[in-house]
């Protein structure tokens, strides 16, 4: 529509130009006729021949002008047709170029749109991946924080348990030392009684040799001595049973000591593996090692406690006669079994519950704490 309208406007401008030329010529001719008429009206003396000649010349000029105008009009029409053809050609070329440009522009625009969509999708994908990584990292950080918090709480709990165990062992150690002192006092008392019995026996033997003539008195003294002997035999049997119990307890402590050494070896192996984690507990383990050294020192002092001497035992089957005027010691205090209660549990403490047992218990407790840390 636009190209056709342009062609029409161009043709109209050409036609208007030709028409304007004709109108100019006619105006000139009309002016000439008007002048001639005016001249005729004003003067009657004008020569008609000259007027005719002049009109003929004017007519020739007008014909020439009309011919010239017609030629120009034809020329303009030809030019107009040529211009129309050129305009159509240029319009077609411009239309093809315009369509090509529009097609290229649309292709370029479509390509840019696709590239933009692709970049936008990639950006959205990167944003999505970034958000997923951030959520994953946040969850991982939260998980590690909770794990560290649980480990710290567990370490605090184990530290409290270890502290309570250490205090309990300290109380048990004090009770064991007190029981040991009581046992040593009782042992010294029994040792003095055995020494006294030994002296009495020596005196009785000497008296029996000196008083062999007095048979009746000797028989009476013999009966009394046999009664004392039975009493001493009962005491000796009681001491023998205590010795058997002590031997059994010592064997049990030996087994516990072997188990403690095995646990100690395992603890040392685990300690080498957990050296990095054990730095935080180094000070506490050093304190426990010092307490263990004290317990071992207590054990060493316990191992030096003297047992009942064989020379103090009464010899069964032999009669003893006292000297004249002497009487056997009948005011012997019966042996009392020393019983104490542990302050931590309230149970009756074994008098043979020595520092070796405490050492085993402390070592086993430390091994259990370290093993729990390794499992965690």
Curated annotation (Swiss-Prot):
It is found in: Secreted, Cell wall. Keywords: Cell wall, IgG-binding protein, Peptidoglycan-anchor, Repeat, Secreted, Signal. Pfam families: Gram_pos_anchor (PF00746), M (PF02370), YSIRK_signal (PF04650). GO terms for cellular component: extracellular region. Its main location: secreted. The modification Pentaglycyl murein peptidoglycan amidated threonine is found at residue 345. It comes from the Bacteria. InterPro entries: LPXTG_anchor, M_anchor, M_repeat, SMCR, SMDRR, YSIRK_signal_dom. D repeats lie at residues 272-277, 278-283, 286-291, 293-298. C repeats lie at residues 153-187, 195-229, 237-271. Belongs to the M protein family. This is Immunoglobulin G-binding protein H.
